[in-house]
Amino acid sequence: MLLAASEGRHWRYEVCEHPDGYLVQMRDLETGDLDEEFSTIFRTMPVAFAYAEMSAAFERYAAAELESVEDDQIEFDLEATERNFIDLSDRLGDSGVNGIAAKAWEQQTAQPIARVLH
């Protein structure tokens, strides 16, 4: 279930429910496709929201830099969202787990352990 979303210039960062907490995933605004390489799972909702906001702010900042747009507000937003994420992450002890690593862990634990007796 989608809980919240934060939009950058080309991507939307969605916070969804996940069995292990809250998943932040990246969706292309033009095509609606998910980027399978970008996903992070957080144990706490506030940190997941802060991460989505920070990711969107960073994308807006990077796009403005590439387009040579001078806008102090974009830089201010990035700094504020980054400070908020770092503060919440530190206070709640939640730095997130890469979604690809979590999938690999789930696949490994789902396989039975082969025991060999000599």
Residue ranges and their predicted role:
Residues M26-D28, E59:
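Short regulatory "switch" loops immediately downstream of catalytic or recognition motifs
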Residues A62, V69-D71, D77-L78:
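A C-terminal-region feature
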